[in-house]
Each structure stands twice: as structure tokens, then as C-alpha cells.
């Protein structure tokens, strides 16, 4: 019989769990008990609750995300890059009887200090679904990952998503704004500005001035700012993009469309893989190996 196993995506604020029989998902569950929201419960107790009626004797559990951080269940040490894709699933951290945490990745050079935790699992899945020499993984912190067919060679992080949130919600740029609305035109205008002038520090206050003076509709500030930041990010990473034969974009639907537009404006073709699809493919491959 094909082995059963449980895959867990356990982040700071949420937990998602899947019960698999081979490659077939039997059931999935979600919880708001992220590692920073355990409400006094132990991680083991939360896991037992979420997987009630799932765990037969010795059913393996493989987890990824912030559960392996210093605020999680137990620190799963980072693997230093360069690192083979295969080594990620070979260096799991045990936290119980057949319960495992996937390690994160780190870079520590004079000119680059970086970490990732959770995205490494997406990378494994993305590599299987759309092999590439450059993986771009937008989100709160966008990861730019250089790889070949066997190993991850380097990565950088750009805090575009978090910066957008901070500027819109905790700076003068967003002070007193009405509810924001979608606007493809405002996003495109910001994108063009960011691509053409990636040094955005002098431009940020202009976003505020533009809506104060009425040249930018106040309801469209978020869209313009999003375009400005994404354009500046992609333009500033031109050297990372140069000479790449294939680019894989790993993200949800909304961010995929925004980054695709940015890459197309630079004349780059990309292949898109849904972030959730990549994560499940990656953690399934590791958990399946553990179970068998």
C-alpha cells in the first residue's frame, strides 16, 4: 500500500495541513495557530489538534516554515548556499516520533547576508514544475534565487511587499487616504517610473505630493506605489536577470500579474508557477521520501 504522510505549512500567523496517500490529497485543514499565536499551547499540542484522526502509528509529519525558526517549535539549522536541492530533504530536524522540520537556507558573504525559511520548499516544487536558472518569489519579502539543475547558488531578498505596507499604513504617504481602489493605469504609471528611475528614495515623497496636489487620485495611491516599488525592484536586479536563460515566477495570482508586467516591460519572458502549487509539490516530494 502507498504510504500515508502529513505535510504542514506552519508560518508565523497560520498553519495549513494536508493528509496524503501517495500523491493523492485525502483532506486538508487550516488553523490560525501560527507559531506566534499558540495562545499558551505547546506546538505538539497544536499539531495533535490539527491532525486529529489523521495520524496512524508512525505516520510521518513533515513541516516547513517558521515552525523551524527561533520563535517556532525547534530551530532547524540553515543550510549554507551553495546547497544541492537534494540536501534539503536529507537534513531534516526531528521534533518527535517521525515528526520532521525542513531546514531553511542562508547566505553569508561580505556582500550578501540572507536567509529564507519556507521558500526553500517552494523552490523544490518550482524546480520540478518549471526548471529555471532564476526563480523570483514575490511576497512580503521577495526572493531572487540563482540556481542550476542541481543546486541553489545564491539568493537575495527585496522587502518590496513589507515596504509597500509600511509606507501606505505607517508613513505620511498614506496618512488620511480614503479606501483604495484597483487601477491598472495607476499601477502602470508607477511601474514605468520605477523601471526608469530605480533610485526611489527621492521619489517617495513625490507620491505624497502628487495626491495632495491632485495629480494622483487619492484612491489610487496604493496602486501607484505598488507599481513604483515593483518597478524599482526589478530594475535594481537587472544584473541578477542578465544572461539568465529561464526565469520562473513563483507567486499568487495578483503578484504574478504585476511582476509579469514588469518583466515584460524589460523584454524578459517568464514562466509562472502558483506559489501554493509549488509549495505542495516541494513538501510532498520530501514527505513522500520520508514515508517510503
Curated annotation (Swiss-Prot):
Keywords: ATP-binding, Kinase, Nucleotide-binding, Transferase. InterPro entries: DGOK, DGOK_C, DGOK_N. CDD domains: ASKHA_NBD_KDGal-kinase (cd24012). It comes from Escherichia coli (strain K12). The keyword Transmembrane does not apply. It catalyses: 2-dehydro-3-deoxy-D-galactonate + ATP = 2-dehydro-3-deoxy-6-phospho-D-galactonate + ADP + H(+). This is 2-dehydro-3-deoxygalactonokinase. Disruption phenotype: Deletion mutant cannot grow on D-galactonate. GO terms for molecular function: 2-dehydro-3-deoxygalactonokinase activity; ATP binding. Its EC number is 2.7.1.58. It is an enzyme of class 2 (transferase). GO terms for biological process: D-galactonate catabolic process. Disulfide bonds: none annotated. The keyword Nucleotide-binding applies. Induction: Part of the dgoRKADT operon, which encodes proteins for the metabolism of D-galactonate. Negatively regulated by DgoR. Expression is induced in the presence of D-galactonate. The gene is dgoK. It holds the Pfam family DGOK. Pathway: Carbohydrate acid metabolism; D-galactonate degradation; D-glyceraldehyde 3-phosphate and pyruvate from D-galactonate: step 2/3. Belongs to the DgoK family.
Amino acid at each position: 500500500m502507498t504510504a500515508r504522510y502529513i505535510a504542514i505549512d506552519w508560518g508565523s500567523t497560520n498553519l495549513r495541513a494536508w493528509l496524503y496517500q501517495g500523491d493523492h490529497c485525502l483532506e486538508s485543514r487550516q488553523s490560525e495557530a501560527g507559531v506566534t499565536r499558540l495562545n499558551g499551547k505547546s506546538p505538539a499540542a497544536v499539531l495533535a489538534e490539527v491532525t486529529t484522526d489523521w495520524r496512524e502509528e508512525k505516520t510521518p509529519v513533515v513541516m516547513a516554515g517558521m515552525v523551524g525558526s527561533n520563535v517556532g517549535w525547534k530551530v532547524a539549522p540553515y543550510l549554507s548556499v551553495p546547497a544541492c536541492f537534494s540536501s534539503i530533504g536529507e537534513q531534516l530536524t526531528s521534533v518527535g516520533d517521525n515528526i520532521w522540520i525542513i531546514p531553511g537556507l542562508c547566505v553569508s558573504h561580505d556582500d550578501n547576508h540572507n536567509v529564507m525559511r519556507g521558500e526553500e520548499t517552494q523552490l523544490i516544487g518550482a524546480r520540478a514544475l518549471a526548471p529555471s536558472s532564476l526563480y523570483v518569489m514575490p511576497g512580503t519579502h521577495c526572493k531572487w534565487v540563482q540556481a542550476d539543475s542541481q543546486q541553489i547558488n545564491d539568493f537575495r531578498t527585496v522587502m518590496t511587499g513589507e515596504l509597500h505596507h509600511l509606507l501606505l499604513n505607517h508613513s505620511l504617504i498614506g496618512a488620511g487616504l480614503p479606501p483604495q481602489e484597483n487601477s491598472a493605469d495607476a499601477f502602470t504609471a508607477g511601474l514605468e517610473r520605477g523601471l526608469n528611475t530605480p533610485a526611489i528614495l527621492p521619489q517617495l515623497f513625490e507620491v505624497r505630493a502628487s495626491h495632495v496636489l491632485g495629480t494622483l487620485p487619492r484612491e489610487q495611491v496604493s496602486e501607484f506605489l505598488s507599481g513604483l516599488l515593483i518597478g524599482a525592484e526589478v530594475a535594481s536586479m537587472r544584473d541578477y536577470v542578465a544572461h539568465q536563460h529561464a526565469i520562473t515566477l513563483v507567486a499568487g495570482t495578483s503578484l504574478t500579474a504585476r511582476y509579469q508586467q514588469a518583466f515584460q516591460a524589460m523584454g524578459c519572458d517568464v514562466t509562472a508557477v502558483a506559489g501554493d502549487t509549488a509549495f505542495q509539490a516541494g513538501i510532498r516530494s520530501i514527505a513522500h521520501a520520508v514515508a517510503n
